Amino acid sequence: MTTPTPVLDTLLDINSASIEHSQLSPRELMLARLAAMVAVDAPPASYLANAGPSAASGITQQDVQDVMIAVAPLVGTAKVVSAGGNLMRALDMAITVADPDGMA
């Protein structure tokens, strides 16, 4: 018997609808999402959830830095610093998932 996952299912549905109805290229879409995550002080899990699609769309570390620089005057330095920390925690999560025994 499968455990119901209504919250996860809803999140997947709204993300799919966003992608389906957007006219942006995958790269532009992921840059916009990154800017929004910085603006709302998204938690590390949000960055982690978007890491795969971001990498697949060609987003680079320089792109991430450029977006953070671009939004800093609008969202404030505290949110940009928080985003940097949350990105680092997301990276740590990804490493832990990829190598749970820490053998890499």
For each of these PLM feature ranges, what is it?
Residues 1-31, 39-41, 45-56, 80-104:
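Acidic, glycine/proline-rich low-complexity segments that act as flexible tails and inter-domain linkers
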Residues 65-89:
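C-terminal structural segments of small proteins and small subunits
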Residues 59-64:
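Winged helix-turn-helix DNA-binding recognition segment
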Residues 53-57, 70-73:
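Short basic/hydrophobic patches in alpha-helices and adjacent helix-turn junctions
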Residues 30-41, 65-74:
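An amphipathic alpha-helical micro-motif enriched in hydrophobic residues
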